[in-house]
Amino acid sequence: MAIAPRGPGRTPEARVEWALKFRLLDLSKLSERARHRAWAMLVAWERGRPAEGPRPARDKVPEAQQALRQVIEALANGLPDVVWMPETTWSIWPARRRRPGARRGGRVTMTTDHTSPGGIPVTPEAIVVAFVNDLNAVEADRLRACPLKTNGTTCGAIFLAARRQIYCTARHAQAAAWLRYQPKRKEKRP
């Protein structure tokens, strides 16, 4: 997956889908530009506004990816996950007033005490909190792991279900239906 130039998306569902793809990304194969873009997207998702300044040498993108991977896999399999949040001071700024005739007003802005000139590292724990907030906004029970078992192994692909979707793809749903049908068919044979 290449890092999308526009970012994780504007809607919570788009950001959750982006996180599902980002957790599988091989960061060692990214170019410097793509790595910077990944850092900028994670900072924007974490803080609710675009990143300013240069990317630090230790950007914590791999740690954020690992934290996302752990929470996604735990929640999709129905398990709890623990996230330790380091002490950080957050400043919360009120939204700007709506201009006359504008449809939308400003957003509440949150800033942290990471104001070093070398750039802002990503806080993996805050990324997990942002992911969970977006997941709750799109109905958290939609995050699932595919239960199809073939030859004793479970598929386990993690996906965001649409409506009553149980399996990750239509092909897996057909395979599961066929597996349920086969024993009945064998019993009817004389």
Locate each region found by the language model.
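Short metal-binding segments enriched for Cys and/or His
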Residues: Q174-K188
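Short helix-coil boundary/hinge micro-motifs
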Residues: M1-L160, R189-P190
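Cysteine-rich micro-motifs
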Residues: A161-A176
